[in-house]
Design a protein with these regions (language model features):
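Patatin-like phospholipase
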Residues: 1-38, 46-251
Length: 251
């Protein structure tokens, strides 16, 4: 039997595009055998397995202008542009509850991509319980420059998109025969280099992350070109915006 895998790129609030696609999947009872998400792709993607249609768009519309949820207020107060307590505790547990039991009952392997701060390498961590592994999901979406690294055990992690923005090759290596890849960038998008001055300043504290950031545009653009070959050859179906989504992104 063919094994179908789903890959979700990050992209901060461009992830609303992903949320809409996932809601359409739920409407049409489209199921996957394995799922991997990066950054916002991981944070929003778990709602697909919990079957909570509309939740991602609903809570982001409700809270994204709340100064306690995200923005300079939590950045100055705790060093994270997205509040750890408000966004990762209050919202999913009380204000707009996430159904962790339904998520676990889906029995679909879900992986969040994180970047190891010490090595600069990607790691793919299976999420068995969203509430028990919230720090892993938080790490996957912890953007450099505006987030503190997240400690998990004796290691520290940042945004998975630093090291592997579109992990389609990794998921194919998990015995998936056919992939659906949701991108948050349009067909013509190619990533540009980051400011080397800014990255080198960041590299004083996180040298391996800085190395990745300096090469990220090359790695991302190579991945996009390879994915287009997979798409043309029928190995992957790619769902992407038809035109640019104009939302600020730091990486």
């Amino acid at each position: 039997m063919m094994k179908k895998g789903l890959v979700m790129e990050g992209g901060a609030m461009r992830g609303m595009f992903t949320a809409g696609v996932l809601d359409t999947f739920l409407d049409n009872d489209i199921k996957m055998d394995s799922v991997v998400g990066v950054s916002a792709g991981a944070l929003f993607g778990v709602n697909y397995l919990s079957g909570q249609k509309g939740r991602v768009i609903r809570y982001n519309k409700r809270f994204n202008k709340d100064k306690n949820y995200m923005g300079f207020h939590p950045l100055l107060r705790e060093g994270n542009i997205v509040s750890t307590k408000y966004a990762y505790e209050d919202v999913p547990k009380t204000l707009d509850p996430f159904d962790d039991e339904a998520y676990k009952k889906s029995n679909v392997p879900f992986y969040a991509v994180v970047t190891n701060v010490a090595t600069g390498n990607p790691e793919y961590i299976q999420i068995h319980s969203v509430f028990e592994q919230m720090d892993t999901l938080r790490a996957s979406g912890s953007m450099p420059f505006v987030s503190k690294p997240v400690a998990i055990g004796d290691k520290k992690y940042l945004d998975g998109g630093i090291a592997d923005s579109i992990p389609f090759e990794w998921l194919a290596g998990q015995d998936c025969d056919k992939l659906i890849v949701i991108l948050t960038r349009d067909m013509e998008y190619r990533k540009k280099p980051m400011s080397p001055v800014l990255v080198k300043l960041y590299g004083r504290k996180y040298p391996k992350i800085a190395e990745r950031l300096l090469q990220r545009h090359n790695n991302y653009n190579r991945a996009v070109e390879e994915l287009r070959k997979w798409e043309a050859g029928g190995k992957a179906m790619v769902i992407r915006p038809s035109s640019p989504i104009e939302i600020l992104s730091l990486i």
